[in-house]
């Protein structure tokens, strides 16, 4: 369940703008046609999964089938579906041609942050509400995203970090997403997307920091000032696992996201011998599952100690 408000109430509040009524009605009538999850997982903590751009929740579940099976004693996976229509992603039609309609989390490169954030919240609410209706009772504790979904997951945990730092206890706010305790980012690249005025500020400061790092003629009065600007760049401190395929054509961009935006004290990189896809081989899946379980044990222990 969402904190402070049921998913049904949250959806109603989010849909106050006319812009979303038609899109929401269409989305709610679509059936994912997922087979019922193992009932033994209903009580387990849940990981919300965000698919890549140009796919959908049904396809992502098929792509995660080996990972979901290997995690079934530790976590329940819950799949959200983006609202924005999209052309199929690269190589999607080779296997999943008949699995449309295809969706994306980001409507366009210059998408309105308010529109995108409302759409994202609707997707998350809907996924959790439907899983609750199937009988799931475990808390939603983590995120798992692939490609564009990983970008959005990273943006969500940055937003959570900024919101907590700005407002402290924000339980009074009219709508709250679950508290993301960790995230697993598969083949994610930057830049992160803006979800509110908070991340707009962080994004501007990050761009300033990059300019100062790469331009000796920055015009700043002293090296001390330069250091102050760089230190204001927001590094994500929510625990994360970054999964990179060594044969992925965008590997350098995935590494760049990790080095530019994440505090290495709270994150770990797993690189595997694969391309731009979710790991399927038992050896790779076992390694990832071990990392997820170790991370969750650490996060849970630190909270108990705190």
From Swiss-Prot:
Top enzyme class, one word, equals hydrolase
Question: According to the UniProt entry, what is the EC number of this protein?
Answer: 3.1.2.-
Per the record, the pathway is: Secondary metabolite biosynthesis
Q: Name one Pfam family in it.
A: FSH1
| Active-site residues per Swiss-Prot or TrEMBL entry | 147 (charge relay system), 248 (charge relay system), 276 (charge relay system)
Keyword list (alphabetical) reads: Hydrolase
GO terms for molecular function, please? hydrolase activity
Output the Gene3D superfamilies linked to this UniProt entry: alpha/beta hydrolase
Return the similarity comment: Belongs to the LovG family.
Which PANTHER family does the record match to this protein? Answer: ESTERASE DBAE-RELATED, ESTERASE OVCA2
UniProt protein name: Esterase tropF
Native species: Talaromyces stipitatus (strain ATCC 10500 / CBS 375.48 / QM 6759 / NRRL 1006) (Penicillium stipitatum)
Q: What is the lineage of its organism?
A: Eukaryota, Fungi, Dikarya, Ascomycota, Pezizomycotina
User: What gene does the UniProt entry assign to this protein?
Assistant: tropF
